[in-house]
A protein has these predicted regions:
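Short, well-structured beta-strand-loop connectors
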Residues: 46-57, 100-115, 285
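Short glycine/threonine/proline-enriched tight-turn/helix- or strand-capping micro-motif at secondary-structure
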Residues: 12-49, 66, 148-153, 186
C-alpha cells in the first residue's frame, strides 16, 4: 500500500527528496527528507511537524559514527489526528531533538524541537526531517520497513543544459545559478530528464535514484517496462517503475571528475544544480559545465 503525502504536508517545506540518501529506509521511495529552510550552509534548526496528532513516544537512537556529528539521533513517533489524511497510520520522524513528549498534542507546522546533524548525514547534506509512514502493526523502531510514498503535489520538470555559474560554495559542494526556479514559492521544481520526469537522488554517489512525475510506459505483457534515463544525452541508468539504478558512471565538472550531483525537488528561489565536490573547489562566478561519463568512456 502506498501512502500519498498531501500538499498540506509538503507545502510547509522548501525542499524534499524521496531518494537522495544512502540509507535503505529510502529504497523505493519509502521515506522522504523534508527541508524546512535554506539558511546559510543549510543549517536551519526549525522542525515543523509534518502532521497534526499525538506524540506516542520519543527516544534516543544510535547513529553511525562521524567526526562531525554526535553519536546519537532522535526518533519521534506520532499518531496522526483522526481527521487528517494519515489517520490510522504511524508517522516516524528522525533528526529532531524533541521539545515534545509522549502524550503531547501537536498541530501541523508546530515545532517538534530542534533539527540536529546526525551521523546519518554526509557533510554536504542540509538539515532536514526524515519522515516515514507505517501501518500501526508494523515495528516502528526498525530503520527500514516504511510504506512507499506518493506525492500529492505536482513537480515541474525544468530543462537544464548542464551549465551554470557558481553562486554559493561550501567545503564539500558548489551550487549553480541554473536551472533557475521560474516562480519561487508557487510550486516545486526539479531537474528534467531527457525523456521527461524529474530526477531525484545522489548521482552516482548514492546507490540509486528516482524519476518522478512521469507516467510509466507499459510493455506488451502489460507490466511496467524498464527504461533508460539520460540527461543531456548522457546515460544515467535504468528506471524500473520510478526507481533508477545508476550506471557505473562519473559526473564531471569542466571535464574533471567530482563526487556527484545532488538532485531534489524545491520551491525556493535558491534552487539550482548542486555539485558534490569535496575533492575540488570552485570560485563564485565560475562557469561550469556538467556532464556524466560512463565507465566505458574513462
Amino acid at each position: 500500500m502506498a501512502v500519498t503525502l498531501p500538499e498540506s504536508v509538503l507545502a510547509q517545506y522548501e525542499r524534499f527528496s524521496l531518494y537522495n540518501s544512502p540509507y535503505p529506509a529510502h529504497d523505493g521511495g519509502c521515506a522522504i527528507d523534508l527541508y524546512p529552510g535554506t539558511l546559510a550552509d543549510g543549517r536551519t534548526t526549525a522542525a515543523p511537524s509534518p502532521v497534526a496528532g499525538t506524540v506516542r513516544e520519543t527516544r534516543t537512537v544510535r547513529a553511525p559514527p562521524k567526526p562531525y556529528a554526535p553519536e546519537h539521533d532522535h526518533l519521534i513517533l506520532i499518531d496522526p489526528a483522526a481527521s487528517g489524511p494519515l489517520a490510522g497510520l504511524t508517522v516516524r520522524v528522525l533528526h529532531v531533538e524533541p521539545s515534545v513528549a509522549a502524550g503531547d498534542r501537536v498541530e501541523r507546522g508546530e515545532s517538534l524541537g530542534r533539527l540536529v546533524r546526525a551521523g546519518f548525514f554526509a557533510p554536504w547534506v542540509d538539515n532536514h526531517l526524515h519522515v516515514g509512514v507505517r501501518d500501526p502493526d508494523q515495528n516502528p523502531y526498525r530503520a527500514s520497513g516504511s510504506l512507499p510514498l506518493e506525492l500529492g503535489v505536482s513537480v515541474r520538470p525544468l530543462e537544464w543544459d548542464g551549465t551554470g555559474r557558481v553562486v554559493s560554495t561550501g567545503d564539500t559542494y558548489a551550487v549553480l545559478d541554473s536551472p533557475a526556479h521560474p516562480d519561487p514559492g508557487a510550486a516545486f521544481v526539479g531537474v528534467r530528464a531527457d525523456d521527461g520526469g524529474v530526477l531525484d537522488g545522489g548521482l552516482p554517489h548514492y546507490d540509486g535514484g528516482g524519476l518522478l512525475e512521469r507516467p510509466a510506459p507499459v510493455d506488451t505483457a502489460g507490466a511496467p517496462a524498464e527504461r533508460v534515463v539520460s540527461l543531456n544525452g548522457d546515460r544515467l541508468g535504468v528506471a524500473d517503475g520510478r526507481t533508477i539504478a545508476w550506471d557505473d558512471a562519473t559526473v564531471t565538472a569542466n571535464g574533471e571528475p567530482i563526487t556527484g550531483l545532488s538532485l531534489f525537488c524545491a520551491r525556493d528561489a535558491d534552487f539550482g544544480a548542486k555539485l558534490i565536490c569535496p575533492e575540488r573547489s570552485f570560485e563564485r562566478g565560475e562557469l561550469v559545465r556538467v556532464r556524466v561519463r560512463s565507465s566505458d568512456e574513462r
